[in-house]
Amino acid sequence: MLASVLIVAAGRGRRFGDPLPKQYLSVAGICSLRRCLDLFLSLGSIGAVQVVIHPEDMPLYSDAVAGLTDMRLLPPVAGGETRSKSVTCGLQALEAHTPDCVLVHDAARPFVSARIIADVLAALETSQAAFAAMPVVDALWRVEDGAALSPVSRDGLWRAQTP
């Protein structure tokens, strides 16, 4: 199975509070987007990588991809007003490549592992959709008007590793 990757990097990161969008922040000397690109482009199971960026971020994007010559990295496309619209823009750009499947990843999550990617691809061999998740282990409480009312059962709850 040859997968395409759609990396969503069009967000503004306003909740984060930094004027620079999270995907362009340096983590141990390498920007988050570049860490994602380096990982996905190191995998032989990836046939194309499409990045969706904010229309005003081309200079930041160019800095992030400086020196990358892998032909699987497609020219970036502009995102939409929301994350879902940005994903749609990216999927439309990938249509011509007719991938077997598309992995959607957020550029602000630089520490995904090759193992997690392999596990998701393996799940896609027998399923139409898959995502990385972890069981909920934290205590959960139902709160109303600032008062804790009752604990919530964690049975059957999983934390998706996506926003």
What positions do the PLM features span?
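N-terminal glycine-rich phosphate-binding loop and ensuing alpha1 helix
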Residues: 2-59
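Acidic metal-phosphate-binding loop of nucleotide-sugar-dependent transferases
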Residues: 107-111
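Residue-level signal for inorganic ion chemistry
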Residues: 7, 33, 90, 105-106, ...
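Structural beta-sheet core signal
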Residues: 5-7, 51, 104, 129-132
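Acidic helix N-cap motif at the loop->helix transition within catalytic regions
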Residues: 59-65
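Short, high-confidence coil segments that cap the C-terminus of an alpha-helix
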Residues: 46, 99, 126-129
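Short phosphate-binding loop-to-helix
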Residues: 66-101
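Conserved core of the sugar-phosphate nucleotidyltransferase
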Residues: 112-163
